[in-house]
């Protein structure tokens, strides 16, 4: 983790939720602006301090987290250069090559123009050129596999410091979704039942995918107040632009697209198509399947989860079976049958329905 302020820069190694080796250096852009010798003098000062830092924290780490306003300003400029369609800074990812390209791009462009394009304050933009020099040389020396941006700062850190360990261990994404469900859903608590209902479709899913499925189930009904013609758009906006933690950009779009398909079969023609480029073909398909599964499962919004029935997914035989209990047979009408077959079709499967006696 690298936190930059006006006068100093701190590095700390984070592993297994614990802070390891850490080091500080006078590499803040405000201080470096006053170094004698111009750019050549700054380069020597930066390299001298980076030598000390690298000796302590090492190189070749999996990820470098950037904290601080100057880093966020550079990340926003990276978005502008790359024409990224999703302007959410938290968990924004960059490669070392992208950082180098952006630093050069900043140097080659007019700062006043860039400030207007990114809505960056004059005071913040004035520090970007020097901060860019530090970041470029820092990335070159540390050689991280990727760079991630944190929108959090000292306020969030102080709050986290006050939390008991049992709260710290919770998933920030799931907790935020639970809160949204409790506050806005028509039937708070049904998201858990819906997740259990869909679980057979994800018997072999990795934990990272399961948490997105769970998050989607918790959020599946929180935008019910929106007009039906626009509900799918509100769902997508809610997931991709809300203040949710623990999500990469591609995960935000996956979650948003799944919720879009919760209310709408087709995504073609929507204003969100540029964002779909953040997902590959398989991810687009998986999000559609999840959305259609929630669309079907939501028809069994009952207080008693045992009345929902159960699905069985046979991926080898490509057969999806729905067992409808006697108490819920009236719920499985023409619309439910159509939604079930739509889900089976998305899976490339044959859909069979069994009515229990």
Where does each model-flagged region fall?
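A short amphipathic beta-strand at an alpha->beta junction
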Residues: 347-357
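Short glycine-aspartate micro-motif
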Residues: 1-3, 64
């Amino acid at each position: 983790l690298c936190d930059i302020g006006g006068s100093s820069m701190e590095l700390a190694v984070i592993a297994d939720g614990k802070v390891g080796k850490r080091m500080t250096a006078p590499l803040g852009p405000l201080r470096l602006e006053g170094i004698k010798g111009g750019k050549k003098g700054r380069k020597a000062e930066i390299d001298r301090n980076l030598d000390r830092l690298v000796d302590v924290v090492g190189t070749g780490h999996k990820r470098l987290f950037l904290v601080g306003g100057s880093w966020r300003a550079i990340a926003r400029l990276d978005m502008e250069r790359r024409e990224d369609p999703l302007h959410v800074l938290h968990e924004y990812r960059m490669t070392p090559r992208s950082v180098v390209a952006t630093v050069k791009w900043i140097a080659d462009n007019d700062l006043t123009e860039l400030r207007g394009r990114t809505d960056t304050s004059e005071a913040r933009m004035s520090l970007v050129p020097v901060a860019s020099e530090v970041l470029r040389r820092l990335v070159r020396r540390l050689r991280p596999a990727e760079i991630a941006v944190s929108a959090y700062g000292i306020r969030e850190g102080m709050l986290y410091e006050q939390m008991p360990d049992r709260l710290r261990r919770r998933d920030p994404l799931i907790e935020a979704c639970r809160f949204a469900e409790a506050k806005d859903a028509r039937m708070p608590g049904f998201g858990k039942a819906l997740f259990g209902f869909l679980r057979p479709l994800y018997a072999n899913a990795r934990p990272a995918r399961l948490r997105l499925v769970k998050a989607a189930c918790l959020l599946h009904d929180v935008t019910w107040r929106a007009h039906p013609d626009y509900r799918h758009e509100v769902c997508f906006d809610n997931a991709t632009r809300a203040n949710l933690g623990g999500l990469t950009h591609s995960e935000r779009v996956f979650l948003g697209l799944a919720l879009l398909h919760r209310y709408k079969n087709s995504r073609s023609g929507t204003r969100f198509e540029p964002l779909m480029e953040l997902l590959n073909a398989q991810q687009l398909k998986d999000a559609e399947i999840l959305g259609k599964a929630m669309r079907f499962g939501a028809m069994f919004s009952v207080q008693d989860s045992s009345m929902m029935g159960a699905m069985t997914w046979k991926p080898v035989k490509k057969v999806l079976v729905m067992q409808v209990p006697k108490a819920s047979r009236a719920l499985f009408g023409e619309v439910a049958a159509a939604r079930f077959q739509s889900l089976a079709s998305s899976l490339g499967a044959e859909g069979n329905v069994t009515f229990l006696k």
